Swiss-Prot record:
Impact noted for substituting R287E: Localizes to host mitochondria. Defective in mitochondrial localization
Species the sequence originates in: Mycobacterium tuberculosis (strain ATCC 25618 / H37Rv)
Name listed for the protein in its UniProt record: Fatty acyl-CoA reductase Rv0547c
PANTHER family, A to Z: DEHYDROGENASE/REDUCTASE SDR FAMILY MEMBER 7B, DEHYDROGENASE_REDUCTASE SDR FAMILY MEMBER 7B
Active-site residues from the entry: Y192 (proton acceptor)
GO cellular component: host cell mitochondrion; membrane
């Protein structure tokens, strides 16, 4: 053990809080009583070229799903698809700039022509901004770009692919959010959390409006995950984080069991506390911010 025992124990406790309850289906709507067989399921996953997305494509490939990998960089996407097909799976790489709504429409049309639609849509691509609110408001272009990628792009994909799911009477939309949405008070993430909160709201409404027609939704409230997206932020260096492979397992669990949400234990606890004592949560978040950003 290279780390000091106390530090190692502290990190393990922190990571335990980042993981979801053992049974994410407990006490929540469960439309799929038996795990869904992913064999042959057409899964479109955005942000598939690296991080959680790349790890998830590999796992879905092992489940014999038809993986449609989407991201901007064709070279990385091709490598992802080649790894899946090399293991005997089925995959295709479709480069797309998700900040371009017309490009998304063209992607949907291409997918419909190639394989006849999508059974499971996973809106994983995202842009994170860690910045004080006042600074974010001074850089309005970053606000707009974050909303476009984190909210408008997923909505546009849903707009294009959901009609086919509804027509077939079966479909699943998995939306990636962040644990900060559940506390509503995470400092330095005003723009990022707002974009993910908007997506989270739509995700829940999908279930209430379309669930009876066979189209379900799941929201994944990820904690800190060790991916290229957080690498530039020095404040995260050395902090406990899930691995991309662990985070990818959440996606597979969601696809197979269709829970309403999967969230870290600590985020669920803070969300419950927020409902009865929001000022306590505000004070907790403020103190945490002062500790991390003295």
């Amino acid at each position: 053990m290279s780390k000091r025992p106390l530090r190692w124990l502290t990190e393990q406790i922190t990571l335990a809080g980042m993981r979801p309850p053992i049974s994410p289906q407990l006490l929540i709507n469960r439309p799929a009583m038996q795990p869904v067989d992913l064999t042959g399921k057409r899964i479109l996953l955005t942000g598939a070229s690296s991080g959680i997305g790349a790890a998830a494509t590999k796992q879905f490939g092992l489940h014999r799903a038809v993986v449609v990998a989407v991201a901007r960089r064709k070279d990385l996407l091709d490598a992802v698809a080649d790894r899946i097909t090399g293991d005997g799976g089925t995959a295709m790489s479709l480069p797309c700039d998700l900040s371009d709504m017309e490009a998304i429409d063209a992607l949907v049309e291409d997918v419909e022509k190639r394989i006849g639609g999508i059974d499971i849509l996973i809106n994983n691509a995202g842009r994170s901004i860690r910045r004080p609110l006042a600074e974010s408001l001074e850089r309005w272009h970053d606000v707009e770009r974050t909303m476009v990628l984190n909210y408008y792009a997923p909505l546009r994909l849903i707009r294009g692919l959901a009609p086919g799911m509804l027509e077939r009477g079966d479909g699943h939309i998995i939306n990636v959010a962040t644990w900060g949405v559940l506390s509503e008070a995470s400092p330095l993430f005003s723009v990022y959390n707002a974009s993910k909160a908007a997506l989270s709201a739509v995700s829940r409404i999908i279930e209430t409006e379309w669930g009876s027609q066979g189209v379900h939704s799941t929201t994944l409230y990820y904690p800190l995950v060790a991916t290229p997206m957080i690498a530039p932020t020095k404040a995260y260096d050395g902090l406990p984080a899930l691995t991309a492979a662990e985070a990818a397992e959440w996606m597979v669990t969601a696809a197979r069991t269709r829970p309403v949400r999967i969230a870290p234990r600590v985020a669920v606890a803070v969300n419950a506390l927020d409902s009865i004592g929001p000022r306590w949560v505000n004070a907790l978040m403020q103190r945490r911010n002062e500790q991390l950003n003295p």
